């Protein structure tokens, strides 16, 4: 029977992580469980840096961006000996289960702990919206608003100077954030990992727009697709139009979470406690068609596929 749980945030921070921690803590305390917060993700778990959390520990946290527990990259956690130390630290503290809030790398850590016999629940916390088994991740909608606001501002200056603007959006190898922001921001061109990209084809489309009288344009592109400064130089050379690239970078991860992210994080945090009390370990939480769901974390990582919103892409093309 579970009496004490641990909670940590791992990987890149996302708006709503604090709300998720709050959801976990308050739901657990309501059920009579103790909660230990683990500082700086798996690194803090390995180094045994933990603190007892109560209701006041998470007061005024629901509206705060980032994660008050901190986060860190810790690739050494792939080492089974490192994980064995982490599990020993958990057991030494009397912790019976662990809630992990983070992206796919964080899920991989939870999967490996699960395979070693320690029950974990994964909550999807990443702006990339690239986690399998869920329609949306904690932080995605806040980041979407941030990106759209940036696109709106870029459009103001691009139209003033009849310029082509390239905006690089986070997402790692998932184009969800780019695609949604491009549609909401009225971008003329969208470049995402899920669709084959050829810069000559992009230039041809831009030239076609210019021939129709288009004075400016915005190209939204997912990070890691190419060097955006080189792409800007190529477009300017081929079209004769001034072209500038803007990398939004880590500003996309910051800021107070929007209401939907706060609600999603709170629901998922409380649901994680429900699952643990029902005897479920080794699960990851998602939301599908606005219903909370859970999947086997090993199966989710190894076998599940995340569909690309191809219908959204087709819609976007009609709006160019």
From Swiss-Prot:
Keyword list (alphabetical) reads: Allosteric enzyme, ATP-binding, Cytoplasm, Glycolysis, Kinase, Magnesium, Metal-binding, Nucleotide-binding, Transferase
**Gene Ontology BP terms:** canonical glycolysis; fructose 1,6-bisphosphate metabolic process; fructose 6-phosphate metabolic process
- Alphabetized Gene3D superfamilies for the sequence: 3.40.50.450, Phosphofructokinase domain
Pfam families, per this entry?
Answer: PFK (PF00365)
- Record-listed E.C. numbers: 2.7.1.11
InterPro entries membership: ATP_PFK, ATP_PFK_prok-type, PFKA_ATP_prok, Phosphofructokinase_CS, Phosphofructokinase_dom, PKF_sf
Q: Quote the subunit structure annotation.
A: Homotetramer.
The identity of this protein, by name, is ATP-dependent 6-phosphofructokinase
Question: Which gene codes for it?
Answer: pfkA
């Amino acid at each position: 029977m579970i009496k004490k749980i641990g909670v940590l945030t791992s990987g890149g921070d996302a708006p709503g992580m604090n709300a998720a921690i709050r959801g976990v803590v308050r739901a657990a305390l309501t059920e009579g469980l103790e909660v230990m917060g683990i500082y700086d993700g798996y690194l803090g778990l390995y180094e045994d840096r933990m603190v007892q959390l109560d209701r006041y520990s998470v007061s005024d946290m629901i509206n705060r961006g980032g994660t008050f527990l901190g986060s860190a990259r810790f690739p050494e956690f792939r080492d089974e000996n490192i994980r064995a130390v982490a599990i020993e630290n958990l057991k030494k503290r009397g912790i019976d289960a662990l809630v992990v809030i983070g992206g796919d790398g964080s899920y991989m850590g939870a999967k490996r702990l699960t395979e070693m016999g320690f029950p974990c629940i994964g909550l999807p916390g990443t702006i990339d919206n690239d986690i399998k088994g869920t329609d949306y991740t904690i932080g995605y909608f806040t980041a979407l608003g941030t990106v759209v606001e940036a696109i709106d501002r870029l459009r103001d200056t691009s139209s003033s100077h009849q310029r082509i603007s390239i905006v690089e959006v986070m997402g790692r190898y998932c184009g969800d954030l780019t695609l949604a922001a491009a549609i909401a921001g009225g971008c003329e061109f969208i470049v995402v990992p899920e669709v084959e990209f050829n810069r000559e084809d992009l230039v041809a489309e831009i030239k076609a727009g210019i021939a129709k009288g288009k004075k400016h344009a915005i190209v939204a592109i997912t990070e890691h697709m190419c060097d955006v400064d080189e792409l800007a130089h190529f477009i300017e050379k081929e079209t004769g139009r001034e072209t500038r690239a803007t990398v939004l970078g880590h500003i996309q991860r910051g800021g107070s979470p929007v209401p939907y992210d706060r609600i999603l994080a709170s629901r998922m945090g409380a649901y994680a406690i429900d699952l643990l009390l029902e005897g479920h370990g080794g699960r990851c939480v998602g939301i599908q068609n606005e219903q909370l769901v859970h999947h086997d974390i090993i199966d989710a990582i190894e076998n599940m596929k995340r569909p690309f919103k191809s219908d959204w892409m087709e819609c976007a093309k009609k709006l160019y």
